[in-house]
């Protein structure tokens, strides 16, 4: 943001400092200075001169000899400029003076050019009359060639640099995008007044307009209020185009803006002064005297002011009349409504458009302007009408036209006032300061923050969209208290050792167990194709099909958020199989996204899943063993139960199980269904397990109880049992735990047999049971009694001891 010091002083007249002091102090208060440019650099001994007499050069047809009154003397100057006449007032650099640069737009030397008296074709010359470029300014503002001629009230001997407004400096600041208010001269002046503790005088805007009603000239309808929260319009008739006054041209030129005429310059001036872009339309070109703010239609062609035809889509907001599009909202107007020299009546527009939409639209159509750059940052809707009224005031003051009374203001949802609790103690604790409430309120008063004593709340003005919480207010205190005044203090509080969150510790254990068992970690996309549901054989009404659609997908294959984690795993296993990798074991931690309702009204439930997949030298029990290792490492050994399930259509119906703890399902495990294998172009057998981490984590524990070495001997009993094949060992182990009591130390499966010696449909299962007492040596009869209880319960399942 470029800020000419003279323009700042127009609002802060008591500002008394050098440009460098201004830049340094503003930097300390939060406005980071990038550079300081002195407009009068290398301009020395330059005064106003009046040409009293002109004579032809005796030996050169293209040179003339001028007698120039420079106040206290008359000097002779030889020049070849064709545009000077007797009586003209011109800038003159005297003998020994210095000018900024050369002619024809050449690059200015670092130290300028020193002027000395000399002879031109035999005639002495005691100085030089200057063009505007030789004074370091731009030809955009002044005539393209020749000596600059003053058209204002100056007299010989006056400081020509001062008369041209070049005794000035422009400070460039790096403004962060959250400080939208500082992308304006008023905003920077407010900051300067607060920083230097000076009074701030913003422009006094008076009521403008004749007795007519603007509604008789124009109607406005906004169809997309979300993209255009406010639209204001006023009408000016009897337009009189002319050059804008020099003070306005100088200020615009200092900002790098080329002056054009009073009408265009006023819109640019107000944009820099208020930070509010404006646009002017020729009202006579607007059909039906109606403005409609709506989205474009995809494929529409529109020619902008720069003569380029651009293709629109439905996301681009357009300004239209009763028949056609006349402007791209917030970016550039149309060639069909441009202001020409023949304009009689104009429509002024000052609006607030959605910053995100403007940024995206600008990118889509490949057009970025000064206006779009400001809108992108998110403007204050309350500023639109203030800027509009200021522009109309300048129209009247400069005699550029007659303002029609009243204004159109479409503002359906005014900005709500933001109030924040004043918490001085918390601010001091955060900053390490000891600032009183009175000091805080004094700082806030400087930047127009109000205070409601009844509620102890700070009232945030609409232009400070960056203030949302206590920490933001604390930053304002720090800025004006002075960062360099905040004492250096050591951190207080009790030092504690770092510790991972419990959830991360559980995930680390699962990850370590998987890797110890030969698994490699991977990561797949959270985006999937709806076709995945068919590949996994999910029913049409399966809850997994209720997936969130992505508004800007990379393609159909990445168009929804996944609701099941298996697709990524199976795709990875299929890729490995295609590359002939043997004995592959993979795991992944990743979220699935379960919407609470569709379309989305709130954030979805993001559930972390640990997915394991393997093929090669393995079977169902290999993967089951890995899951059991994880549960053992999480203090859940012996608490899990495995129940056969047919709930998951993508798993083999006879080789799948749900894993539960305390009756709550934490995982499922099984072999992939053969049809699903075909869908993923895989052969052989693939086994997967999916663990729901939000269910598992609360059940895990890292508390461990250690017992000393046993003092008394153990007693073992081996049981070889015959049972139907559909009885699971988990059912047997539950009976062991229930009936074995405290004396049952452990049990271990050591044999499973099916064959000729066992009746068809039956199997033999053998367990070794270990019994031990902590306080005595067990007797055989005592153990036999417990075993009898176990056998009695097993008989109820149809389990018999093998003969």
How would you describe each model-predicted region?
Residues 48-78, 261, 267-336:
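Conserved mixed alpha/beta core segments that line enzyme active sites in large multi-domain catalysts
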Residues 41-44, 208-210, 495-500, 524-543, ...:
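Beta-rich nucleic-acid/ligand-interaction surfaces
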Residues 446-449, 596-600, 605-606, 611, ...:
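A carboxyl-terminal module marker
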